[in-house]
């Protein structure tokens, strides 16, 4: 089972709001997910992001692969840097 950290689209038409979820890569974009680890609202200025850092680091350490967009969000929040430091300083 390949696990991804990706965006799940919520909100109404032309008013997107995203949940950052951990899901099996075979499940649909807005379908079944394993865990919710954050939210992302691109319409606010600046974009509003809420992340559960410990949960995300745990999933990354267990082999979950972030999507490109989620990887950018995590990089801006500094989580990817912490993950790489922990991974390569063992």
UniProtKB/Swiss-Prot annotation:
GO cellular component, one term: cytoplasm
MF (Gene Ontology): structural constituent of ribosome
Transmembrane segments: none
Designated gene of the protein: rpsP
Signal peptide: none
Keyword Secreted in annotation: no
GO biological process: one example: translation
Family stated for the protein in its record: Belongs to the bacterial ribosomal protein bS16 family.
Keywords of this entry: Ribonucleoprotein, Ribosomal protein
Gene source species: Lactiplantibacillus plantarum (strain ATCC BAA-793 / NCIMB 8826 / WCFS1) (Lactobacillus plantarum)
Identification of the protein by name: Small ribosomal subunit protein bS16
The organism's taxonomic lineage, starting at the top: Bacteria, Bacillati, Bacillota, Bacilli, Lactobacillales
One Pfam family cited in the UniProt record for this chain: Ribosomal_S16
InterPro entries cross-referenced by the UniProt entry: Ribosomal_bS16, Ribosomal_bS16_dom_sf
